[in-house]
A protein has these predicted regions:
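Structured, basic alpha/beta domains of bacterial-type, RNA-associated proteins
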Residues: 1-19, 23-145
Length: 145
């Protein structure tokens, strides 16, 4: 029985599974979003969030080397520490989001999903007012008889 066994095996050897997660995490940090199966997206999400937390804590040689043990390309590690980490400096967690897709993969009918970095494709919903609201724009209540 497989009770209390965490993680998915994906019918791969441990080294192949580890390399799969490394490649998915590297591609996610490089492109900002990837389309994959739902199971792989759920498995790579905590893996990626731990790496982003390393970069969020700031650049030092130890954190950079720890990130390089996970990522497969050095330029992605530089981008992680220079762009992605500072972007999430004030965010306490939840750097990625998984969207389930309605379509399934044609060959084996597996559920597909998009995993993306939060804030990668979002635009601010409110305009940024530099000077604040002026008194002329606040609504006036008419007092009449």
């Amino acid at each position: 029985m497989r009770h209390r066994k965490a993680g998915r095996k994906f019918k791969r050897t441990p080294s192949h599974r580890r390399m799969l997660l490394r490649n998915l995490a590297t591609d996610l940090l490089d492109h900002g979003r990837i389309t994959t199966t739902l199971a792989k997206a759920k498995e790579v999400q905590p893996y990626t969030e731990k790496i982003i937390t390393l970069a969020r804590d700031g650049w030092n040689l130890n954190n950079f080397r720890r990130a390089l043990t996970v990522l497969t390309r050095r330029e992605v590690a530089f981008r992680l520490f220079n762009e992605i980490g500072p972007r999430y400096k004030t965010r306490p967690g939840g750097y990625t989001r998984i969207y389930k897709l309605a379509k399934v993969r044609q060959g084996d009918c597996s559920s597909m999903a998009v995993i993306s970095l939060v804030g990668e494709d979002e635009t601010p919903s409110k305009p940024n007012l530099q000077g604040g609201a002026s008194p002329a724009t606040t609504p006036q209540v008419a007092s009449g008889v």
